[in-house]
């Protein structure tokens, strides 16, 4: 649990930083000041809204993020054939392992698996009826799958936009989000920069909120209590997640490298979560008749081995 709380802090740092960079792009607010503003807004949302309201707020943000990137994708010329090939047979440039692992960590976000589980468990159901249990399991599966697909789609949209906008036009050195946003202006017009910044701000806010909720869920779980913003454990978990994340931003020199390595840490932690969850969901003692089938276990172990191999590759290449 402590490792997953650290993962939540790493995520919160990246999301607060992303929101702060967006504020800098939109209003020229210094990143460190912007980080504190994002922290205040997120804590206000966490502590003053019931979960249902936060859930609706996050759904609104995610919808707007998707809409923003849809507009940006429509503004550039995408080589969809090359994109399809890249999805199936990706090419890994030299020294790109930290970026690859950071994308993996950003999409999967191991701490959110605990948040998804808590969301399902928090609903009041009659768990003595087989039909209700089956419905719960299907809902959990769909909730997690939908979240993963949305995360994958938004990350893919950003990669496609970067490839079509920068690299096809010879801009091969983009190592800062602010620079990336500014470079969109001469290529696509000022509207593209504003849309990019708005999407980044919404992504930072929504992801920071979920990171705080995940931290609250994990910390409450340490004391065997459910998530509830009115409880002491949940509030402490949110604060333990969000405040250190914001303080770390005040200490780092390169915001962009901070983003990369914080998300890379999530990927490094991912095998621990995967192996633990495979063990628990495959245990008949824990899951009873709902334990993983032999075929599903083989698939899950294969995924775990691949993710572990990627992490080994990360350390072998020396970052």
Q: Model segments located where?
A:
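Hydrophobic alpha-helical segments and their helix-loop junctions in multi-pass secondary transporters
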Residues: 63-89, 97, 104-120, 276-285, ...
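Helix-loop-helix module between adjacent transmembrane segments
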Residues: 1-15, 20-50, 105-106, 202-207
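Extracellular/periplasmic helix-exit of transmembrane alpha-helices
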Residues: 120-129, 149-179
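Transmembrane alpha-helical segments of multi-pass small-molecule transport proteins
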Residues: 1, 26-48, 64-69, 228-247, ...
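Select transmembrane alpha-helical segments in multipass membrane proteins
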Residues: 1-6, 92-104, 152-162, 186-205, ...
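Loop-to-transmembrane helix boundary motifs in multi-pass membrane proteins
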Residues: 35, 146, 191-193, 205, ...
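C-terminal membrane-solvent junction of multi-pass transporters and transport-like membrane proteins
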Residues: 57-60, 217, 231-236, 255, ...
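Membrane-interface loop-to-helix entry segments
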Residues: 37-38, 46-76, 264-266, 270, ...
